[in-house]
């Protein structure tokens, strides 16, 4: 639980991971964050090897099916899920087999039909359930009440949409520089928002921007320090580099700054520190992959 609570998820993930003692109260988005970013580190030294390897089938499959960037590997994800379900009763016992476990075998077909898991996920609506509930004044004709209240709110909704905002943009407040790279993707010179992966697979720690003027957004370049020591974190059922996951030493940074354009950035990275000094696992923030 202590290691779990110390994980600093990036700004784009609004819910901080809570202690395992609150597991019964975790929201669906917290479970997703644990699976995508914390699980392979937290479970590594806490599960027997055979159970951990079985879990990795699920982790890799869900990761692959969560982005169209991995579309050429979706078929492998389907195979991993088949193996996960087939071996489930051997690992956990037949009494834990359920329809939810069986339904994993249909995930590949559904993703092929409707799109990546991220594009068909309902996580963004999770926080809106409370607002829907508040639109109801009685138990009579609930749906009509909700529709009427939402329609009324839409008439007064004046907030800007992302389509009205030009990307990238730079904001400086004190010693903190924030680059809004793309919708839902920020780089900031702090602990949890500074790591990103370049398209040539270099891991870089963001330091500063180089911009000719406040309005010259087309000439923004990113400056940062390259991580010199990195390697694979696993090689089964596929190599971690195939899904852009690496381990690295956070104090092995290049001495000189490197500079690149926004177009050279592949994705933001979530840095999850292990129990080894200065070692971190770098995992792509799924929705920022291009």
Task: Give the ranges of each region predicted by the language model.
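Terminal interaction-prone segments of large eukaryotic proteins
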Residues: 1-290
């Amino acid at each position: 639980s202590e290691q779990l609570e110390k994980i600093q998820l990036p700004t784009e993930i609004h819910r901080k991971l809570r202690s395992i003692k609150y597991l019964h109260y975790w929201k669906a988005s917290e479970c997703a964050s644990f699976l995508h970013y914390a699980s392979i580190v937290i479970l590594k030294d806490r599960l027997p090897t055979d159970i951990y390897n079985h879990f990795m089938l699920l982790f890799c499959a869900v990761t692959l099916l969560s982005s169209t960037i991995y579309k050429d590997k979706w078929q492998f994800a389907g195979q991993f899920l088949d193996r996960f379900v087939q071996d489930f009763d051997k690992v956990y016992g037949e009494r834990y087999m359920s329809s939810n476990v069986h339904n994993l075998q249909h995930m590949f077909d559904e993703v092929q039909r409707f799109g990546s898991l991220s594009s068909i996920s309902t996580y963004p609506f999770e926080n809106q359930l409370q607002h829907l509930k508040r639109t109801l004044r009685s138990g009579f004709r609930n749906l009509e009440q909700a529709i009427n209240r939402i329609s009324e709110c839409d008439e007064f909704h004046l907030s800007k949409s992302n389509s009205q905002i030009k990307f990238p943009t730079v904001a400086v407040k004190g010693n903190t520089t924030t680059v809004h790279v793309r919708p839902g993707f920020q780089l900031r010179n702090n602990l949890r928002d500074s790591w990103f992966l370049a398209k040539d697979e270099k891991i870089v720690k963001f330091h500063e921007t180089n911009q000719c003027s406040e309005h010259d957004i087309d000439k923004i370049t990113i400056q940062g320090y390259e991580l010199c020591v990195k390697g694979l974190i696993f090689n089964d059922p596929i190599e971690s580099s195939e899904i852009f996951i690496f381990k690295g030493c956070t104090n092995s940074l290049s001495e000189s700054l490197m500079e690149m354009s926004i177009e050279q950035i592949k994705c933001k990275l979530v840095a999850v520190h292990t129990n080894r000094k200065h070692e971190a696992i770098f995992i792509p923030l799924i929705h920022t992959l291009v």
